[in-house]
């Protein structure tokens, strides 16, 4: 939110704010079911704050809720049946902004793209686009790994790569690019890039560091059931898993 405050998304408790100096936690955005224009859900999968200080919330399972801090008002974005100019699915798991200021949403039925300049929507990898050949349409994480190159991961063994210019889709499964007998992941829960340009991918069986240019893949043994990846500094990464939190040097 700023240098002193962080927003924390919860599953059932809405959004809380923590002061990084005092560690004081206070409710920030909580459902108000008695108001027609209040917050409408407490299960928040992801948070994004834009340049206008609007808070975009992946409000599971009812779409996107946008809170405007300047006017304390809310706006709702939902899927409209048969309308291609809408969010592809209301069950949103992740939100990112790319280098050009446009937004991408990972959902339980494909990926939605929102052009912030024109207000136009596009979607890929959903059940409505059978020509793209993917059998799984649930995506849990999304990341811009290079300018205009988007990776999306979910309930599949690898990542789908989307070229923003052409909206063409390709598939990348790391074990195929190594000479090891590492088994493919059951799912990809988080994809991140670090300061050096490496791509980090965390799944059910392993943590991987990928060089996009050379397609070299390094596996980190002993780390599995990955849920979150955050870069601490140039030499270390925080790795969250189903069993705890690790600091990787």
What annotation goes with each model-predicted range?
Residues 1-249:
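Carboxylate-rich, polar loop motifs that coordinate divalent cations or form catalytic acidic clusters
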């Amino acid at each position: 939110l700023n240098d002193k405050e962080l927003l924390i998304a919860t599953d059932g408790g809405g959004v809380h704010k923590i002061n990084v100096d005092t560690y004081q936690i206070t409710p920030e955005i909580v459902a108000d079911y008695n108001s027609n224009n209040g917050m409408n859900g407490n299960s928040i999968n992801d948070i994004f704050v834009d340049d206008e200080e609007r808070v975009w919330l992946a409000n599971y399972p009812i779409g996107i809720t946008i809170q405007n801090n300047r006017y304390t008002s809310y706006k709702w974005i939902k899927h409209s049946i048969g309308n291609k100019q809408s969010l592809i699915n209301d069950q949103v798991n992740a939100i990112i902004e790319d280098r050009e200021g446009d937004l991408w949403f990972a959902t339980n039925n494909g990926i939605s793209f929102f052009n912030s300049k024109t207000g136009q929507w596009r979607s890929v990898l959903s059940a409505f686009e059978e020509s793209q050949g993917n059998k799984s349409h649930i995506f849990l994480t999304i990341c811009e790994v290079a300018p205009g190159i988007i990776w999306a991961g979910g309930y599949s063994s690898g990542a789908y790569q989307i070229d923003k210019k052409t909206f063409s889709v390709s598939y990348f499964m790391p074990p195929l690019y190594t000479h090891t007998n590492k088994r493919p992941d059951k799912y990809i829960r988080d994809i991140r890039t670090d300061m050096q340009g490496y791509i980090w991918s965390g799944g059910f069986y392993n943590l991987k560091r990928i060089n996009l240019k050379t397609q070299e893949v390094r596996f980190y043994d002993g780390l599995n059931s990955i849920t979150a990846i955050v870069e601490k500094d140039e030499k270390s990464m925080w790795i969250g898993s189903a069993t705890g939190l690790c600091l990787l040097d």
